[in-house]
Regions:
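Pentatricopeptide repeat
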Residues: 15-20, 24, 35, 50-55, ...
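Methionine-biased hydrophobic packing positions in alpha-helices, especially
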Residues: 7, 42, 58, 77, ...
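N-terminal targeting peptides
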Residues: 1-20, 29-37, 41-44, 48, ...
Length: 438
């Protein structure tokens, strides 16, 4: 902007090239207010913005995910009779495809064709990615067929996008066919291709196939990265095979690929699931010593591990460690502890936790209250269950079917027929069906 001001002060009228250079710099540095100011100055000085001027603004606002601003400049471009080019459409199509707004994406694709412009491989891939995100694999594959039909051959990014979509829909046989097609067309799979397929098979619990792909990948001289290892380690842990997960951990280190917070979180959670809290603590200490900051999910896993191993008190004491690390407990933290105390029949502790939640402005949910209500109801402590039920209503939290059935069964067992019928009627009014036995 200073360059433009200096030229104007010397009586030199900046041209379109100067203005475009200034716009480019401002957009690259995210100075959007200044960019708008320069755009206005161009008009005031009688310099008509061209397609490049508009593209810089449209592209810039697309990058910072401001669709309204991007569309505003596109409409201004059309109003002034400036013909959009493939860059203009690429920006807008990419923006809406990334957001899964496929009606808008298709509209800009049609408009592009009306100007006699044909999509290139990048645009086709963005559209395919949009349909995959929206869960419309039929449309994604249709666009792929159209792309090939127009002589625009998919590259590795296009194939990886389709593979990811198919794996998300658990269509692994179709994904395998696509991998074969990819090879037949002379497009070599890359690290992303294999990691996507490995993730798909791990989600299905087919660890054997995931490991086969891992071996194929190594045979093809593709070096795995931390994402590949995290995917496999997570797959092993989900199958309960911590031994194999530890082997992968060792293999990873032997290749000088080092764990990140995701790796540690997976292993901490898995050891806690098995009640191996000491092992989980070993990973937590190592993680902290390496300067990797645990997040709320990591801490919640440790608390869950204590609760599962019947040591809720230690889990609650661990809250202080969280706070010392500037990590505040959330709803999952408190629900885990409440569930643990209900299992141990220490119901008075659940009240303490409710008070702590209130003090820390953590809003309990239906699950929180259901656990406490059920804990009191199964032991016939209906006075306390009623108090919690009323507290739930006072906080604006709606009971669900489980809430009503816990309360009704508790009152029936206590011989309180009046209360149980009142709750039964209220339950029906809310649209919940009672148990057949009631």
């Amino acid at each position: 902007m200073a360059v433009v001001d200096s030229m104007v002060s010397q009586g030199i009228k900046p041209g379109i090239l100067t203005y475009n250079a200034v716009l480019k710099g401002l957009c690259r540095n995210g100075k959007w207010d200044k960019a708008r100011e320069v755009f206005r100055a161009m008009n005031e000085c009688g310099v008509a913005p061209d397609v490049r001027s508009f593209n810089m603004l449209i592209g810039g606002f697309c990058r910072v995910k401001e669709p309204d601003e991007a569309m505003k400049f596109y409409k201004e471009m059309r109003r002034r009779g400036v013909t959009p080019d493939i860059v203009s459409f690429s920006c807008l199509i990419g923006l809406f495809a990334r957001r899964g707004k496929m009606d808008r994406t298709a509209a800009y694709l049609r408009e592009m064709r009306e100007f006699g412009l044909m999509p290139d491989g990048v645009i086709y891939t963005m559209v395919i990615g949009g349909y995959c995100r929206a869960g419309s694999m039929l449309e994604a594959l249709r666009v792929r067929d159209e792309m090939v039909g127009r002589g625009c051959l998919p590259d590795v990014v296009t194939y990886n996008t389709l593979l990811n979509g198919l794996c998300k829909e658990r269509r692994l046989s179709d994904a395998e066919e696509l991998l074969t097609e990819m090879r037949e067309r002379g497009v070599p799979p890359d690290l992303c291709t294999f990691t996507t397929l490995i993730h798909g098979y791990c989600r299905e619990g087919n660890i054997e196939k995931a490991l086969q792909l891992f071996e194929t990948m190594l045979h093809e001289r593709l070096m795995p990265d931390i994402v590949t290892y995290n995917t496999l380690i997570d797959g092993m842990c989900r199958q309960g095979d911590l031994g194999k997960a530890n082997e992968l951990w060792d293999d990873m280190h032997s290749r000088e690929i080092f764990p990140n917070h995701i790796t540690y979180s997976i292993l901490i959670d898995s050891h806690c699931e098995k009640g191996q809290v000491d092992d989980a603590f070993g990973f937590l200490d190592e993680m902290i010593n390496k300067g990797i900051v645990p997040n709320i999910m990591t801490y919640n896993s440790i608390i869950k591990g204590y609760c599962r191993s019947g040591n809720v008190l230690k889990g609650q004491q661990f809250l202080q460690k969280m706070r010392d690390a500037k990590v505040l407990p959330d709803l999952i933290t408190y629900n885990t502890l409440i569930h643990g105390y209900v299992k141990e029949e220490k119901m008075h502790e659940t009240f303490n936790l409710l008070n702590m939640m209130e003090n820390e402005k953590v809003q309990p949910d239906t699950v929180t209250y259901n656990m406490i209500i059920n804990g009191f109801s199964v032991h016939g402590n209906m006075q306390e269950a009623d108090w919690v039920y009323k507290k739930m209503g006072a906080r604006g939290i709606e009971p669900d079917r489980y809430t009503y059935m816990s309360m009704i069964n508790g009152h029936v067992a206590a011989g309180n027929s009046k209360e149980s019928f009142q709750l039964h009627d209220e339950m029906l009014q809310k649209g919940f069906a009672p148990d057949d036995k009631f």
